[in-house]
Amino acid sequence: MEPDRQADIAALDSTLTTVERVLDVDGLRARIEKLEHEASDPQLWDDQARAQRVTSELSHAQGELRRIEELRARLDDLPVLYELAAEEGEGAAEALAEADAELKALRADIEATEVRTLLSGEYDEREALVTIRSGAGGVDAADWAEMLMRMYIRWAEQHKYPVEVFDTSYAEEAGIKSATFAVHAPFAYGTLSVEQGTHRLVRISPFDNQSRRQTSFAEVEVLPVVETTDHIDIPEGDVRVDVYRSSGPGGQSVNTTDSAVRLTHIPTGIVVTCQNEKSQLQNKISAMRVLQAKLLERKRSEERAELDALKGEGGSSWGNQMRSYVLHPYQMVKDLRTEYEVGNPAAVLDGDIDGFLEAGIRWRNRKDDE
Protein backbone atom coordinates (compact mmCIF):
# COMPACT_ATOMS: atom_id res chain seq x y z
CA MET A 1 0.00 0.00 0.00
CA GLU A 2 1.27 3.46 -0.88
CA PRO A 3 2.46 5.66 2.04
CA ASP A 4 -0.19 8.32 1.33
CA ARG A 5 -3.01 5.81 1.69
CA GLN A 6 -1.43 4.37 4.83
CA ALA A 7 -1.29 7.87 6.30
CA ASP A 8 -4.94 8.49 5.38
CA ILE A 9 -6.03 5.27 7.08
CA ALA A 10 -3.95 6.07 10.17
CA ALA A 11 -5.53 9.53 10.38
CA LEU A 12 -9.02 8.04 10.14
CA ASP A 13 -8.15 5.50 12.82
CA SER A 14 -7.02 8.31 15.13
CA THR A 15 -10.22 10.29 14.50
CA LEU A 16 -12.48 7.29 15.03
CA THR A 17 -10.65 6.31 18.23
CA THR A 18 -11.25 9.82 19.56
CA VAL A 19 -14.94 9.58 18.62
CA GLU A 20 -15.23 6.22 20.41
CA ARG A 21 -13.65 7.70 23.52
CA VAL A 22 -15.72 10.90 23.57
CA LEU A 23 -18.98 9.06 22.93
CA ASP A 24 -18.01 6.47 25.56
CA VAL A 25 -18.83 3.31 23.61
CA ASP A 26 -18.62 1.09 26.72
CA GLY A 27 -20.97 3.42 28.55
CA LEU A 28 -23.29 3.37 25.53
CA ARG A 29 -23.45 -0.43 25.67
CA ALA A 30 -24.27 -0.28 29.39
CA ARG A 31 -27.00 2.29 28.72
CA ILE A 32 -28.52 0.08 26.02
CA GLU A 33 -28.57 -2.87 28.42
CA LYS A 34 -30.34 -0.74 31.04
CA LEU A 35 -32.89 0.57 28.54
CA GLU A 36 -33.54 -2.94 27.18
CA HIS A 37 -34.28 -4.05 30.73
CA GLU A 38 -36.74 -1.17 31.15
CA ALA A 39 -38.33 -1.88 27.76
CA SER A 40 -38.96 -5.51 28.72
CA ASP A 41 -41.03 -4.48 31.76
CA PRO A 42 -44.66 -5.55 31.05
CA GLN A 43 -45.94 -2.54 33.00
CA LEU A 44 -43.95 -0.02 30.97
CA TRP A 45 -46.85 0.84 28.67
CA ASP A 46 -49.05 1.73 31.63
CA ASP A 47 -47.25 5.06 31.37
CA GLN A 48 -47.42 6.00 27.67
CA ALA A 49 -45.11 9.01 27.96
CA ARG A 50 -42.41 7.01 29.78
CA ALA A 51 -42.75 4.11 27.35
CA GLN A 52 -42.27 6.37 24.35
CA ARG A 53 -39.25 8.02 25.99
CA VAL A 54 -37.62 4.67 26.81
CA THR A 55 -38.21 3.15 23.36
CA SER A 56 -37.05 6.32 21.61
CA GLU A 57 -33.86 6.50 23.70
CA LEU A 58 -33.22 2.79 23.15
CA SER A 59 -33.65 3.07 19.39
CA HIS A 60 -31.34 6.10 19.24
CA ALA A 61 -28.66 4.47 21.43
CA GLN A 62 -28.75 1.24 19.43
CA GLY A 63 -28.47 3.18 16.19
CA GLU A 64 -25.54 5.21 17.49
CA LEU A 65 -23.66 2.10 18.66
CA ARG A 66 -24.40 0.28 15.40
CA ARG A 67 -23.10 3.25 13.40
CA ILE A 68 -19.82 3.38 15.34
CA GLU A 69 -19.31 -0.40 15.16
CA GLU A 70 -19.95 -0.38 11.41
CA LEU A 71 -17.42 2.43 10.93
CA ARG A 72 -14.82 0.48 12.91
CA ALA A 73 -15.48 -2.69 10.87
CA ARG A 74 -15.20 -0.79 7.57
CA LEU A 75 -11.95 0.84 8.70
CA ASP A 76 -10.52 -2.53 9.71
CA ASP A 77 -11.46 -3.95 6.29
CA LEU A 78 -9.90 -1.10 4.32
CA PRO A 79 -6.24 -2.32 4.37
CA VAL A 80 -7.51 -5.72 3.21
CA LEU A 81 -9.22 -4.08 0.22
CA TYR A 82 -5.94 -2.47 -0.83
CA GLU A 83 -4.05 -5.76 -0.39
CA LEU A 84 -6.59 -7.58 -2.56
CA ALA A 85 -6.40 -4.80 -5.16
CA ALA A 86 -2.63 -5.24 -5.37
CA GLU A 87 -3.11 -8.96 -6.09
CA GLU A 88 -5.71 -8.49 -8.83
CA GLY A 89 -3.35 -8.37 -11.79
CA GLU A 90 -5.31 -7.12 -14.82
CA GLY A 91 -8.19 -5.95 -12.63
CA ALA A 92 -5.92 -4.09 -10.22
CA ALA A 93 -6.83 -0.60 -11.47
CA GLU A 94 -10.56 -1.18 -11.04
CA ALA A 95 -10.12 -2.80 -7.61
CA LEU A 96 -7.87 0.06 -6.51
CA ALA A 97 -10.48 2.59 -7.63
CA GLU A 98 -13.11 0.76 -5.56
CA ALA A 99 -10.84 0.82 -2.51
CA ASP A 100 -10.18 4.55 -2.99
CA ALA A 101 -13.94 5.16 -3.26
CA GLU A 102 -14.48 3.33 0.02
CA LEU A 103 -11.70 5.37 1.64
CA LYS A 104 -13.38 8.59 0.51
CA ALA A 105 -16.84 7.45 1.66
CA LEU A 106 -15.49 6.27 5.00
CA ARG A 107 -13.74 9.58 5.60
CA ALA A 108 -17.03 11.43 5.02
CA ASP A 109 -18.95 9.09 7.34
CA ILE A 110 -16.38 9.34 10.14
CA GLU A 111 -16.29 13.12 9.86
CA ALA A 112 -20.09 13.22 10.06
CA THR A 113 -20.01 11.09 13.22
CA GLU A 114 -17.25 13.27 14.66
CA VAL A 115 -19.66 16.24 14.53
CA ARG A 116 -21.75 14.50 17.20
CA THR A 117 -18.85 14.93 19.66
CA LEU A 118 -19.12 18.72 19.25
CA LEU A 119 -22.61 18.77 20.76
CA SER A 120 -21.59 19.42 24.35
CA GLY A 121 -23.68 22.47 25.21
CA GLU A 122 -25.86 22.59 28.32
CA TYR A 123 -29.05 21.79 26.40
CA ASP A 124 -27.64 20.13 23.27
CA GLU A 125 -28.85 16.67 24.28
CA ARG A 126 -32.48 17.82 24.46
CA GLU A 127 -35.30 17.32 22.02
CA ALA A 128 -36.08 20.35 19.86
CA LEU A 129 -39.04 22.69 19.62
CA VAL A 130 -39.09 24.37 16.20
CA THR A 131 -41.16 27.43 15.26
CA ILE A 132 -41.32 28.77 11.71
CA ARG A 133 -42.82 32.18 10.88
CA SER A 134 -43.40 33.74 7.49
CA GLY A 135 -41.72 37.11 7.00
CA ALA A 136 -41.53 39.69 4.23
CA GLY A 137 -42.89 38.54 0.87
CA GLY A 138 -46.66 38.20 1.21
CA VAL A 139 -48.23 34.97 0.00
CA ASP A 140 -44.85 33.77 -1.30
CA ALA A 141 -43.42 34.11 2.21
CA ALA A 142 -46.31 32.09 3.66
CA ASP A 143 -45.72 29.40 1.04
CA TRP A 144 -41.99 29.52 1.79
CA ALA A 145 -42.63 29.01 5.51
CA GLU A 146 -44.65 25.89 4.71
CA MET A 147 -41.86 24.62 2.42
CA LEU A 148 -39.37 25.02 5.29
CA MET A 149 -41.66 23.18 7.66
CA ARG A 150 -41.87 20.30 5.20
CA MET A 151 -38.06 20.34 4.78
CA TYR A 152 -37.44 19.85 8.50
CA ILE A 153 -40.16 17.24 8.89
CA ARG A 154 -38.75 15.31 5.91
CA TRP A 155 -35.28 15.49 7.51
CA ALA A 156 -36.70 14.07 10.74
CA GLU A 157 -38.56 11.32 8.89
CA GLN A 158 -35.40 10.30 7.02
CA HIS A 159 -33.67 9.87 10.39
CA LYS A 160 -36.75 8.13 11.86
CA TYR A 161 -37.23 10.90 14.42
CA PRO A 162 -40.85 11.32 15.62
CA VAL A 163 -42.38 14.75 14.95
CA GLU A 164 -45.25 16.24 16.94
CA VAL A 165 -47.01 19.25 15.42
CA PHE A 166 -48.45 21.54 18.09
CA ASP A 167 -49.87 24.38 16.04
CA THR A 168 -50.24 25.47 12.42
CA SER A 169 -51.61 28.91 11.58
CA TYR A 170 -52.62 28.85 7.92
CA ALA A 171 -52.46 31.88 5.66
CA GLU A 172 -55.52 32.97 3.69
CA GLU A 173 -54.35 32.20 0.13
CA ALA A 174 -51.61 29.60 0.56
CA GLY A 175 -48.94 28.47 2.98
CA ILE A 176 -48.72 29.20 6.69
CA LYS A 177 -48.28 32.23 8.91
CA SER A 178 -46.50 30.12 11.52
CA ALA A 179 -46.11 26.58 12.81
CA THR A 180 -44.65 24.97 15.91
CA PHE A 181 -43.55 21.34 16.15
CA ALA A 182 -41.30 19.15 18.27
CA VAL A 183 -38.61 16.76 17.03
CA HIS A 184 -38.40 13.92 19.54
CA ALA A 185 -34.82 12.69 19.36
CA PRO A 186 -31.76 13.00 21.59
CA PHE A 187 -29.51 15.89 20.48
CA ALA A 188 -32.23 17.27 18.21
CA TYR A 189 -31.83 20.70 19.82
CA GLY A 190 -28.03 20.74 19.56
CA THR A 191 -28.27 19.70 15.93
CA LEU A 192 -31.12 21.92 14.74
CA SER A 193 -30.20 25.00 16.76
CA VAL A 194 -27.76 26.01 14.00
CA GLU A 195 -30.83 26.50 11.79
CA GLN A 196 -31.98 29.52 13.79
CA GLY A 197 -32.26 32.67 11.76
CA THR A 198 -33.78 34.01 8.58
CA HIS A 199 -34.00 31.84 5.47
CA ARG A 200 -34.31 33.61 2.10
CA LEU A 201 -35.94 32.18 -1.03
CA VAL A 202 -35.52 33.55 -4.57
CA ARG A 203 -37.75 32.07 -7.28
CA ILE A 204 -40.30 32.79 -9.99
CA SER A 205 -43.46 33.33 -7.98
CA PRO A 206 -46.19 30.75 -8.72
CA PHE A 207 -48.67 33.33 -7.41
CA ASP A 208 -47.68 36.13 -9.83
CA ASN A 209 -49.64 36.30 -13.09
CA GLN A 210 -46.63 37.92 -14.77
CA SER A 211 -44.22 35.21 -13.51
CA ARG A 212 -41.87 37.71 -11.92
CA ARG A 213 -39.00 36.80 -9.65
CA GLN A 214 -39.88 37.09 -5.97
CA THR A 215 -37.72 37.19 -2.84
CA SER A 216 -39.33 35.80 0.31
CA PHE A 217 -38.23 35.42 3.92
CA ALA A 218 -39.10 33.12 6.80
CA GLU A 219 -37.71 32.92 10.31
CA VAL A 220 -36.75 29.70 12.08
CA GLU A 221 -36.56 29.52 15.87
CA VAL A 222 -35.26 26.43 17.69
CA LEU A 223 -35.64 25.91 21.45
CA PRO A 224 -34.78 23.03 23.79
CA VAL A 225 -37.75 21.10 25.14
CA VAL A 226 -38.21 21.84 28.84
CA GLU A 227 -37.66 19.11 31.42
CA THR A 228 -38.76 19.01 35.06
CA THR A 229 -35.20 19.73 36.18
CA ASP A 230 -35.45 23.19 34.60
CA HIS A 231 -37.92 24.27 37.30
CA ILE A 232 -39.96 26.44 34.95
CA ASP A 233 -42.96 26.87 37.24
CA ILE A 234 -45.81 29.06 36.00
CA PRO A 235 -48.33 30.28 38.60
CA GLU A 236 -51.88 29.69 37.41
CA GLY A 237 -52.73 33.36 37.83
CA ASP A 238 -49.97 34.35 35.39
CA VAL A 239 -51.68 32.68 32.43
CA ARG A 240 -54.85 33.70 30.63
CA VAL A 241 -56.52 30.85 28.75
CA ASP A 242 -58.69 31.51 25.68
CA VAL A 243 -60.39 28.81 23.62
CA TYR A 244 -61.59 28.92 20.02
CA ARG A 245 -62.36 26.64 17.09
CA SER A 246 -59.48 25.11 15.15
CA SER A 247 -59.04 26.42 11.62
CA GLY A 248 -57.47 25.01 8.48
CA PRO A 249 -56.24 26.37 5.15
CA GLY A 250 -58.18 29.41 3.98
CA GLY A 251 -59.56 30.03 7.44
CA GLN A 252 -62.12 27.21 7.28
CA SER A 253 -63.09 25.60 10.57
CA VAL A 254 -61.91 22.02 11.04
CA ASN A 255 -63.61 21.42 14.39
CA THR A 256 -67.15 21.96 15.63
CA THR A 257 -66.03 22.51 19.24
CA ASP A 258 -63.82 25.12 20.87
CA SER A 259 -60.83 22.78 21.18
CA ALA A 260 -58.04 25.19 20.17
CA VAL A 261 -56.24 26.93 23.03
CA ARG A 262 -54.45 30.26 23.28
CA LEU A 263 -52.26 30.90 26.34
CA THR A 264 -51.12 34.41 27.23
CA HIS A 265 -48.37 34.74 29.83
CA ILE A 266 -49.44 37.98 31.47
CA PRO A 267 -46.08 39.06 33.01
CA THR A 268 -44.18 38.77 29.70
CA GLY A 269 -46.91 39.04 27.07
CA ILE A 270 -45.79 35.78 25.43
CA VAL A 271 -48.65 34.19 23.46
CA VAL A 272 -48.79 30.50 22.53
CA THR A 273 -51.49 28.71 20.54
CA CYS A 274 -52.17 25.03 19.97
CA GLN A 275 -54.93 23.52 17.85
CA ASN A 276 -53.62 20.26 16.42
CA GLU A 277 -54.85 17.96 19.19
CA LYS A 278 -58.47 16.76 19.22
CA SER A 279 -59.34 17.85 22.74
CA GLN A 280 -59.09 21.15 24.56
CA LEU A 281 -57.20 19.50 27.44
CA GLN A 282 -54.59 17.99 25.11
CA ASN A 283 -54.11 21.34 23.38
CA LYS A 284 -53.71 23.10 26.72
CA ILE A 285 -51.05 20.62 27.85
CA SER A 286 -49.15 20.99 24.57
CA ALA A 287 -49.42 24.79 24.65
CA MET A 288 -48.08 24.83 28.21
CA ARG A 289 -45.03 22.84 27.07
CA VAL A 290 -44.35 25.40 24.36
CA LEU A 291 -44.83 28.28 26.81
CA GLN A 292 -42.37 26.69 29.24
CA ALA A 293 -39.79 26.39 26.46
CA LYS A 294 -40.23 30.06 25.56
CA LEU A 295 -39.87 31.11 29.20
CA LEU A 296 -36.72 29.00 29.49
CA GLU A 297 -35.37 30.81 26.44
CA ARG A 298 -36.19 34.15 28.03
CA LYS A 299 -34.50 33.11 31.27
CA ARG A 300 -31.34 32.03 29.48
CA SER A 301 -31.25 35.16 27.35
CA GLU A 302 -31.35 37.30 30.47
CA GLU A 303 -28.45 35.34 31.93
CA ARG A 304 -26.23 35.67 28.89
CA ALA A 305 -24.39 38.69 27.59
CA GLU A 306 -25.67 38.22 24.03
CA LEU A 307 -29.41 38.11 23.46
CA ASP A 308 -29.04 35.88 20.41
CA ALA A 309 -27.70 32.91 22.41
CA LEU A 310 -30.83 30.86 21.71
CA LYS A 311 -32.66 32.97 19.16
CA GLY A 312 -31.55 34.47 15.87
CA GLU A 313 -31.10 38.24 15.95
CA GLY A 314 -33.72 40.55 14.51
CA GLY A 315 -36.66 39.78 12.28
CA SER A 316 -37.17 38.26 8.87
CA SER A 317 -35.43 40.79 6.67
CA TRP A 318 -32.60 41.02 4.14
CA GLY A 319 -29.92 42.04 6.64
CA ASN A 320 -30.46 39.11 9.02
CA GLN A 321 -30.49 36.20 6.60
CA MET A 322 -28.34 33.15 7.37
CA ARG A 323 -29.09 30.99 4.32
CA SER A 324 -30.14 31.72 0.76
CA TYR A 325 -32.14 29.32 -1.42
CA VAL A 326 -32.03 30.40 -5.08
CA LEU A 327 -34.27 28.58 -7.57
CA HIS A 328 -34.03 31.23 -10.32
CA PRO A 329 -32.06 32.36 -12.33
CA TYR A 330 -29.72 29.58 -11.14
CA GLN A 331 -29.98 26.70 -8.65
CA MET A 332 -28.07 27.08 -5.39
CA VAL A 333 -28.52 26.82 -1.63
CA LYS A 334 -25.78 28.63 0.31
CA ASP A 335 -25.21 29.17 4.01
CA LEU A 336 -23.90 32.69 4.46
CA ARG A 337 -22.10 31.89 7.74
CA THR A 338 -20.24 28.73 6.80
CA GLU A 339 -20.02 29.24 3.00
CA TYR A 340 -21.30 25.66 2.61
CA GLU A 341 -23.34 25.38 -0.58
CA VAL A 342 -25.25 22.81 -2.63
CA GLY A 343 -26.37 23.07 -6.25
CA ASN A 344 -29.44 20.86 -5.79
CA PRO A 345 -32.19 22.85 -4.01
CA ALA A 346 -34.78 20.14 -4.67
CA ALA A 347 -32.84 17.62 -2.57
CA VAL A 348 -32.28 20.18 0.20
CA LEU A 349 -35.97 21.12 0.33
CA ASP A 350 -36.77 17.40 0.52
CA GLY A 351 -34.84 17.14 3.78
CA ASP A 352 -31.25 16.55 2.65
CA ILE A 353 -29.74 19.11 5.06
CA ASP A 354 -27.16 17.05 6.98
CA GLY A 355 -24.29 18.80 5.19
CA PHE A 356 -25.60 22.20 6.30
CA LEU A 357 -26.14 20.97 9.85
CA GLU A 358 -22.62 19.52 10.11
CA ALA A 359 -21.03 22.67 8.67
CA GLY A 360 -23.10 24.81 11.03
CA ILE A 361 -22.11 22.82 14.10
CA ARG A 362 -18.42 23.02 13.20
CA TRP A 363 -18.77 26.77 12.53
CA ARG A 364 -20.44 27.31 15.90
CA ASN A 365 -17.76 25.29 17.66
CA ARG A 366 -15.02 27.43 16.10
CA LYS A 367 -16.88 30.60 17.11
CA ASP A 368 -17.14 29.36 20.70
CA ASP A 369 -13.39 28.71 20.78
CA GLU A 370 -12.50 32.22 19.59
Swiss-Prot record:
The modification N5-methylglutamine is found at Q252. InterPro entries: PCRF (IPR005139), Pep_chain_release_fac_I (IPR000352), Pep_chain_release_fac_I_sf (IPR045853), PrfB (IPR004374). It is found in: Cytoplasm. The keyword Cytoplasm applies. Coiled coil: none annotated. Methylated by PrmC. Methylation increases the termination efficiency of RF2. Keywords: Cytoplasm, Methylation, Protein biosynthesis. One of its GO terms (molecular function) is translation release factor activity, codon specific. One of its GO terms (cellular component) is cytoplasm. Its main location: cytoplasm. Peptide chain release factor 2 directs the termination of translation in response to the peptide chain termination codons UGA and UAA. PANTHER family: CLASS I PEPTIDE CHAIN RELEASE FACTOR, PEPTIDE CHAIN RELEASE FACTOR 2. NCBIfam families: prfB (TIGR00020). This is Peptide chain release factor 2. It comes from Mycobacterium avium (strain 104).
